[in-house]
Each structure stands twice: as C-alpha cells, then as structure tokens.
Amino acid sequence: MRASISKSSIKGEVFAPPSKSYTHRAITLAALSKESIIHRPLLSADTLATIRASEMFGAAVRREKENLIIQGSNGKPGIPDDVIDAANSGTTLRFMTAIAGLTDGITVLTGDSSLRTRPNGPLLEVLNRLGAKACSTRGNERAPIVVKGGIKGSEVEISGSISSQFISALLIACPLAENSTTLSIIGKLKSRPYVDVTIEMLGLAGVKIHTDDNNGTKFIIPGKQKYDLKQYTVPGDFSSASYLLAAAAMLEGSEITVKNLFPSKQGDKVIIDTLKQMGADITWDMEAGIVTVRGGRKLKAITFDAGSTPDLVPTVAVLASVAEGTSRIENAEHVRYKETDRLHALATELPKMGVSLKEEMDSLTITGGTLEGAEVHGWDDHRIVMSLAIAGMVAGNTIVDTTESVSISYPDFFKDMRNLGAKVKEIPEE
C-alpha cells in the first residue's frame, strides 16, 4: 500500500496505542505462568507472532473483548510440533529462542526475509554456555535457528552493544533453569530501559532478579523459580505516540490531546522532554496520563543521544529536519540493526524532501529547513513509514510506500491521523 499525504493540521483527542514492549513481555510471562489475564494488550503483527509462538510452546490463548486469557505452561514449555515463525518480530525471535532452551527437545525458529538478516550471535553463544545447544542453520548467526533445550545455569557474559533483547530473553528464561545464573554485561548496555521494563514485569510475575553492582550490569538470577502473572493492564506506548506528538508540534494550527500516557519504565517517554527542549508547546499531566501539544512554535536544534531510545530516532530526525539550526543524533549505531538499517534509510529518504543530512556510522547530523513534497520509500519498516508520513504532513504533496508495515506496532496509525484531521489517502497497489 501507498499513502498520498497533503499539508495538514491535526486537532482532537486520541488514545495512545498499548505498548508493544509491555505486551510482548506480558504474553511471554503469562505463557510461562499458570493462568493470566492481560487487559488491553496491543494486537499487532509483532505481538500476534508472540501469541502464536507461545501457543506452540503449549500455552492456550483466547481473546475476550479487550482482554487476553492465557493458560500457560506453568514453567514447563513443551516441544513445538512445527517451526516457529516469528514473522518480522525481533523480540519474538529472541525471547522464544531463549525459551526453546528450556524444553526437552529441539526447536526451529525463523522469520521473514528482514528478520533473517538480523544478528543473534551473542544470544546463541550464551545459550550454549548455559547448557543448551543453539546454532544458525546457515552458520551466520542469523535465523533460521535450531535450539536443543538444556539450560542449566552458569556464570556468563554477553555484549550489550547490539540488542538489549538478548539480555531480556535470558532474564526471562534463566529463572526456570536448574541452577542460578550470573549474567554480566560487557561494554555499554544499549537500550537499557527495555531491560528495566523486563525486570519490572518479572517482578510482577513473582520472579526475583538481583543486580550485583552499582552500574546495574551484573544480574544474579536464582534458578527453579515460578512464574505467577495473574492480571496485568498494558500501558500506552510512548514510541507510537511520538509520531502523534511530533506531528502536532510541527504543524501550525494543531492541538491534540493524547491519553493513556502514564509514567512507566519506558525510555521513550523522553520524547516529551525532547520536544520541550526543542521549544514545543507541550504539557504532561502524569496523574491523568494526558499529554497536550499545540503547534505553531518554531523548533530549535538539539543533540539527541539515542543510546537508550533507538526507536525514537526516526521521529527525532524528522523534528530536526524542520528545526532552526543543526541537530545531531548520536550514539546510534545499534539503530542500524532494526527491521532495516534505519540510519541509512533516513539518510536516503529525507534528502529527497530537501533535508541537508550527513550520515556517519553512529550518527546523523541534520540541518533544519523547509520540507518539500516527494515520493519516498518506507523501506517496509513501520517506524520509517510513520516518520516519513508526519514529514509529509508538513511538506504536502508526498507519497510514502509500504504503508502496510504500520501493522507491526500501530495498526490504526493512519486511521487515527485521519480522525484528527490529517489529509492522508491510502492508495492500493496496482
């Protein structure tokens, strides 16, 4: 699908979609518990992949209105009777690869063409040290992956520089190992807030994780624990909401209220402080979970450290494109290992809209100006598509392709934007 986008302003109220990160974790932990109810989960392509994978490990999942009722494996995941297809979901692939190490048999996991390009080497290496046997069928650390269960627990190290999903996956699996595990992070832990979300969720499920140093990069994980996630309500997603907030800040005459944005461990809530730093008219009523943005103010250039919040890079890049001065997005090499190489995708597409941009291995330098309408490629990446779409609302006369990819994290993105008054028309492929 393609979208034709004209100059717009947006007004009204909208609910932030449920958090993808929290939904993935809630489903996964519920599937390892006995019986759980998850209220208001995000049902998107990625989270549906986690549901399907959980069912293959023995969980029973049913939907009742806005809830998921999950009968879990009670800490004993079964052997899947077919290949687990994680589709486009890196979280699903990494979490389920670790859980496969708990079974009494062999599990095969794969994904779509994009997911099969993403690295998994550090996770496979640690699983082997923990007593499982894990390998890539192609010998290149990419899916398809084969795992023979046998995690027993040990003292292991893992790099934190590629993906925090590896660490979260191990934190989820190792509490069910026979023995305790000590997991030490080598180097700087990228995307730390996602690990904090995992530990928060594990605590709600009754699982204990201890940190053994001041930096929080050494985790002591007792074995033979029990999962017991009874009920959980999924919070709103700041990453998905960032496109709504940024659009309103950039578009003159706009004023929107985004609900269901309460304080949480999500690192992406920094989008609110980022917009304030850039000079946007934005307020956050934390107690009510309501963020209000009014457009019209000229935005100022900033330096943005993407180390903890890689998913905000496309949003911030578009904001920088209209800001006065030169902005720098740095500490961002790990953004290259997402659904696409997002730094390269942004460096390719934004100049088509008149943006002056310099790409380096771990950074983007962007000089703000006037966005121009163009036909741009969405790279079949939900975050690239949504960021280019809001750029198109500023520029007008813009066409973005591969718009169906928004189903990964925010299926109602274009619907919500149209309801707020954005001039967006979806064009079926011929």
From Swiss-Prot:
It comes from the Archaea. 3-phosphoshikimate binds at residues 20-21, 25, 163-165, 191, 311, 338. Its EC number is 2.5.1.19. GO terms for cellular component: cytoplasm. Pathway: Metabolic intermediate biosynthesis; chorismate biosynthesis. One of its GO terms (molecular function) is 3-phosphoshikimate 1-carboxyvinyltransferase activity. It catalyses: 3-phosphoshikimate + phosphoenolpyruvate = 5-O-(1-carboxyvinyl)-3-phosphoshikimate + phosphate. Keywords: Amino-acid biosynthesis, Aromatic amino acid biosynthesis, Cytoplasm, Transferase. It is found in: Cytoplasm. HAMAP family: EPSP_synth. Catalyzes the transfer of the enolpyruvyl moiety of phosphoenolpyruvate (PEP) to the 5-hydroxyl of shikimate-3-phosphate (S3P) to produce enolpyruvyl shikimate-3-phosphate and inorganic phosphate. Monomer. This is 3-phosphoshikimate 1-carboxyvinyltransferase. It comes from Methanosarcina mazei (strain ATCC BAA-159 / DSM 3647 / Goe1 / Go1 / JCM 11833 / OCM 88) (Methanosarcina frisia). The gene is aroA.
